[in-house]
């Protein structure tokens, strides 16, 4: 009986680890990233052309000021919302860094948005970024981002794509993906935005 119970507990734990990590927020909070299983795509109603970020002022992990104007710096911005406690988030970061370099010439930028909202995690986040080689921009969650976006995220990683005006293009993607999967998604969205 003990072995069976232990097996059930371990099996459940593995299932949880295999997918996206919960945010610790109300799991019914919103439409963005609602499908919390690995690799799921969330078709949120009205997601196309929605300004999910709104106006914001924040800083990067290294302290530089950032506003919503960063989206105008590229034809397409891939925003990967991640957390320091999320294994799948951290595992995909090296490949996201490779994609950032490979797609830079095509007008694509990748931005990481840390969903951890307390300062002690910022040092941990910096260590993770350095260890994984994820040298693309990572921004911290301002009050505006917490209210307008992070409150609607039910799992990390969640990835969204934004055009130059900051409008969401396509769907929100919950869960980590391989470099090849992200490359295919990028190609599809670049075709849609005419880049």
Each model region followed by its residue ranges:
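Bacterial N-terminal signal peptides that target proteins for export
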Residues: 1-8
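C-terminal motif of bacterial Sec signal peptides marking the signal peptidase cleavage site
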Residues: 16-20
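Bacterial signal peptide processing site
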Residues: 22-25
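A short beta-strand-turn-helix
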Residues: 55-77
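Aromatic-flanked redox-active Cys/Sec active sites in thiol-based oxidoreductases
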Residues: 80-85, 115
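Structural microenvironment flanking redox-active thiols in thiol-disulfide oxidoreductases
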Residues: 90-131, 143-148
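Short, internal strand/loop/helix patches
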Residues: 126-162, 173
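Thiol-/selenol-based redox modules, centered on thioredoxin-like
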Residues: 163-195
